[in-house]
Amino acid sequence: WAIGGERIEPLERNAVESFATRLAALPAGSDPAAGLEEVILAMAIDRRVENRAFAAILLALEGSYDVAVEMLCAEEPGRRLEGRQWSALEAATIPRALARGPESAARLRKAWEDRGPAGRVELLMAMARGPDDAELASGADATLVEALGSPELVVRRYALKDLVDVVEPSVFDRARFRPEAPDEARRDGLAWWRSLQAKGGIRRSR
């Protein structure tokens, strides 16, 4: 899968080559399973973001979500993912974790507890699932809009992701709010989403 299968740009191309090279360099006669795990864990702490993200995806396939969650929550310079990288990693790991059933979802919840911002587990789990129409009608729309004002980047990113998934705004309107922007630069975008929510506009069109 990792070498010849699905590609999830912009994270994977160089990481696949690094992964294949490291596997090929394993000593002859070594235990394949142990060698594979050694390579994945080494890539998980690599300085290159694409290698860390690729390892996070492979670990998530094994049912371990700590590395993925840590990367999704990172805010420090040099560790924080760019917007496209964040979206690609989230899409490659979190939906699958939720779709695998209660045990997998419980492991994901534990990863949010251990690696995510304090006190945000329930909100992050809800945003990772995405709201249904009944939840939007009963207040999830306001919750998502107010989450755009969160001090935590991962919360702002998830809130915007869910709002965009629901509303499907134009490219211009989608660009009004950038989660990574400084506080002052986010105010107008937040005001736009609040205005839309006040008009009952946070609803699916179909």
Annotate the PLM regions:
Residues 1-206:
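Extended repeat-based scaffolds of very large eukaryotic assembly and lipid-transport proteins
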